[in-house]
Amino acid sequence: MKPLSSPLQQYWQTIVERLPEPLAEESLSAQAKSVLTFSDFVQDSISAHPEWLTELESQPPQADEWQHYVAWLQEALINVSDEAGLMRELRLFRRRIMVRIAWAQTLALVTEESILQQLSYLAETLIVAARDWLYDACCREWGTPCNAQGEAQPLLILGMGKLGGGELNFSSDIDLIFAWPEHGCTQGGRWELDNAQFFTRMGQRLIKVLDQPTQDGFVYRVDMRLRPFGESGPLVLSFAALEDYYQEQGRDWERYAMVKARIMGDSEGVYANELRAMLRPFVFRRYIDFSVIQSLRNMKGMIAREVRRRGLTDNIKLGAGGIREIEFIVQVFQLIRGGREPSLQSRSLLPTLSVIAALHLLSENDAEQLRVAYLFLRRLENLLQSINDEQTQTLPSDELNRARLAWAMDFADWPQLTGALTAHMTNVRRVFNELIGDDESETQEESLSEQWRELWQDALQEDDTTPVLAHLSEDDRKQVLTLIADFRKELDKRTIGPRGRQVLDHLMPHLLSDVCAREDAAVTLLRITALLAGIVTRTTYLELLSEFPAALKHLISLCAASPMIASQLARYPLLLDELLDPNTLYQPTATDAYRDELRQYLLRVPEDDEEQQLEALRQFKQAQLLRIAAADIAGTLPVMKVSDHLTWLAEAMIDAVVQQAWVQMVARYGKPNHLNEREGRGFAVVGYGKLGGWELGYSSDLDLIFLHDCPMDAMTDGEREIDGRQFYLRLAQRIMHLFSTRTSSGILYEVDARLRPSGAAGMLVTSTEAFADYQKNEAWTWEHQALVRARVVYGDPQLTAHFDAVRREIMTLPREGKTLQTEVREMREKMRAHLGNKHRDRFDIKADEGGITDIEFITQYLVLRYAHEKPKLTRWSDNVRILELLAQNDIMEEQEAMALTRAYTTLRDELHHLALQELPGHVPEDCFTAERELVRASWQKWLVEE
């Protein structure tokens, strides 16, 4: 055994002073001293359980001892009689065995392959034991789940990722999917439960037993987000539901994940074989599947963006040449050829890599380099995590942990270790890059004239610029030269580093040649240099623009078209990744797919990391906003569709924010107990104004009110019990907080909740009964006008139906026409006096006479005036469809309705484009005169004349 290095010997002296009496220094072997010095986790564990050290010394860890885990655990559980006892014994067993594995790993008593096998089989043993104990307990409590033939139905558990592949790392989440074979009901219990209910409840208890922290720690962090439909899907699915999902909706990333899926426990039973046979055609296609190449390219891009997003420069898993790239290389061949080559259908990486070499899909040299690199990286990863039983793949920055790793990896010092690490990761990155090329072969770098380089290097006199800037006016030419000079002066103030300078010197001649070819070169260059000034110290973004000419061209065209987009990219350079793929850049997400896209995006972020969750929500919104704006600029989205996309995006955000707030509140207080006998959350979010009317703009805030149907006597069922209505108040406050918290990516949305009953003086969240009573007995006419543009944007079906009924009832109340006309007109006049344009030579598109607000007031007045006679007028909340309804119900002539619709969409379109130009919403007085006259005439007809 290698002696401890000098820094570790010094550290050992500090440990001796802390050791409990049973671990006196003179009684410890050299092996024990080495392991205790290396791992704080082992040190803490053995200090708490000195008998474990005796066991380690008398029965040292063996490579094949995983075969005894089941028997050892059964013995530990033999006297367990309740769930608390089960949780305690599982946690102690896991800790005891992990200490043995850490001991064997630190001292290199067994191979790294054996360590991975032991870690994986330990997890499987604990999962299966917990499942089987709980299954028996649940059957005693609720009866045995059976199919139509009366045959007992088991819970099958798919272990995904490294758990499925038998390659679990030392401190790891476990990704699981739960399934049961056939529908049916329980038999033999006090009451009958549907199988879905039985397995859902059992699954929830299983997750709690494994995942919930106690004074003994936890067993494993359980991640269920890889199941069909993710967080929004059922916790447990029948075989039939699984098959339907993967046949009809399974995506390439799910094929990628399913390659390693393994059934935990009895993997050779009838049901296990049935499940495996059902999934195989989805994962492994019968033909050689080169169609997967594009998906794999996309995944490669996702890896690169993840590395940039999180700054993972020292990450041995996700960084360039890291563990994930080796896994990716192997799975490329499995996904492409696995259907035709059964030998490639292994879940484990190293055996599959051997098959790949045997089939000559990789050279023997490349395969061997990958094998050696993989074992090196996995040992380094497991050692790193075993120091403190911590889930990390980032190399340490402190001297102690660096000394620990260098010693355990058998290197003299840290520089020697990092040198070997760099060599391995370089080999991996080379194979990775060779395997997955770009869509098109790289074109040769366009030869730039020496003058463009000299222009950037400030080596040209003004007279020398004529050839390259000949098409520009003299003023523009001078402005371009000034901008370049100012940008270079700005760079001199920054700490860029030699690599950044090199990339910038390569990028700028390309950029200048493209920008200066434009007639609007000066204004475009102004916007782009402002953007570049914000990212010059972040070389990865400069490299992105330098290495992907298409991304640079998109950047130039978008910045030229819209200062708003230029500002967004400057504030949030992470959005530059969106420029890589024009197929998504100019093609916004389908309106009904935002929720699913957001769910997939959030899968990358730890569920319990609120800061990263907030950041991810904002980054997703900004990326989607960029796509919508790009499509708007390109002319592929008309104004109505722009608002549709912005509205659907906002609704997806509301859905995710409510979900996060709900999970956080329930974790703290439990659920209100009136929900125990029903589905849903008893909560709704109502959108007013532009959100309610499907008319959001690029910078619109959200007008929201919150409703609940919680009885007065309801309480929460958690350890910290609170009043049910107090729970919903805190939920609404939490939602407001999640929307408004400012992170490095800004806020999510400005939220205005003042349209709630009694405005800012009222409760933030209102019961459905109180809302209905307020609308009937206290609300002003303007509040009923606002209700015309209101709809539920998140909520249980029963609350949605209740709100719709209240809205319909209020809007269909009989109203005296003259009184209503006066109240609506006077409210509009007050608004115009307060909000109207103060510049006599300008027209405020929204607030001035003949503008958008006049059209909105006309439609609201007519709905409130005539809905009593024509209830169908209450159906929609947006102005365009309300105008259609007014024509269809003979309130307004069709010609007038169509003319108002055209005026409305024309003015809205102009507002969108002004927003893209970061200009205020007013135009010269002589603009839109025809539309304004039309609106004035309609206003006069409906709201002035008797």
Curated annotation (Swiss-Prot):
Transferase among keywords = yes
Q: An example Gene Ontology cellular component term from the record?
A: cytosol
- Select a single GO molecular function from the record's annotations and give it: magnesium ion binding
State the source organism's domain of life: Bacteria
| InterPro entries assigned | GlnE, GlnE_rpt_dom, NT_sf, PII_UdlTrfase/GS_AdlTrfase
Q: Which keywords does this chain's UniProt record carry?
A: ATP-binding, Magnesium, Multifunctional enzyme, Nucleotide-binding, Nucleotidyltransferase, Transferase
According to UniProt, the reaction catalysed is:
[glutamine synthetase]-O(4)-(5'-adenylyl)-L-tyrosine + phosphate = [glutamine synthetase]-L-tyrosine + ADP; [glutamine synthetase]-L-tyrosine + ATP = [glutamine synthetase]-O(4)-(5'-adenylyl)-L-tyrosine + diphosphate
For this chain's UniProt record, which GO biological process terms are given? regulation of glutamine family amino acid metabolic process
Residue ranges of the region described as Adenylyl removase: 1-440
Give the EC number: 2.7.7.89, 2.7.7.42
Gene3D superfamilies for the chain: 1.20.120.1510, Beta Polymerase, domain 2 (3.30.460.10), Glutamine synthase adenylyltransferase GlnE (1.10.4050.10), Nucleotidyltransferases domain 2 (1.20.120.330)
List the residue ranges forming a coiled coil, or say none. Answer: none
What EC class does the entry list?
transferase
- NCBIfam families noted in UniProt: PRK11072.1
Record's function text: Involved in the regulation of glutamine synthetase GlnA, a key enzyme in the process to assimilate ammonia. When cellular nitrogen levels are high, the C-terminal adenylyl transferase (AT) inactivates GlnA by covalent transfer of an adenylyl group from ATP to specific tyrosine residue of GlnA, thus reducing its activity. Conversely, when nitrogen levels are low, the N-terminal adenylyl removase (AR) activates GlnA by removing the adenylyl group by phosphorolysis, increasing its activity.
Q: Which PANTHER family match?
A: BIFUNCTIONAL GLUTAMINE SYNTHETASE ADENYLYLTRANSFERASE_ADENYLYL-REMOVING ENZYME (PTHR30621:SF0), GLUTAMINE SYNTHETASE ADENYLYLTRANSFERASE (PTHR30621)
Q: Which family does it belong to?
A: Belongs to the GlnE family.
The family database entries (HAMAP family) matched by this protein are listed as:
GlnE
| Full protein name | Bifunctional glutamine synthetase adenylyltransferase/adenylyl-removing enzyme
Highest lineage ranks of the organism?
Bacteria, Pseudomonadati, Pseudomonadota, Gammaproteobacteria, Enterobacterales
**Source gene?**
glnE
